[in-house]
Amino acid sequence: KEMPNVIVKNRAQVFGYYDHNMLVMSERINDHLPKSKKYSPKQRLWYIRAKEVVISSGSIERPLIFGNNDTPGVLLTSAAKEYLKVYGVLVGKKPLIFTNNDSAYETAIEFKKNGIWPIVLDTRSNPDSEIINEAKSMGIDIRFSHVVIAAKGYKKVKSAEIAKISEDKKDLGKIENISCDCICVPGFWTPTIHLASQS
């Protein structure tokens, strides 16, 4: 912000990328203020012509899909970790973490550091990484080759149906019901390429 050749627009979003590096941006000027000036615009549309463009639009976390995954108490692991680390809020006291990658273990470790014992279900058969070994050394309950079949509970998660899954991911073992009050899911990350695909 202090650089003389940089303009920062905080409440703005680029939504179009056209020929010859022309971008279109919408800026929200005062729609967030409780009382705005009488004749000031709520939004402003910018047409930007750039010599060069750097797109850093990030990625979107995908959920894993299972029955009743729209029940209150089912959320992304990144959201659960954010609530805990930024706001000091536990999303549950008996969390179940259902994953197919290593990113969930960061959330499991955060739960454990805050006195909560999570259960981790990992679709992979025997993954090996530093963060998984750290979770194991902390005594976190990890069940490999397991999946969530469905969330159970009326108005909120009270339990989950889980099962062991075969190596080829086609067959399920015996279905069991385990008690939990939230289900955290990280599916993986999808790059946000919408602007890049317009250029």
State what each model feature region is.
Residues K1-S199:
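Residues forming the flavin
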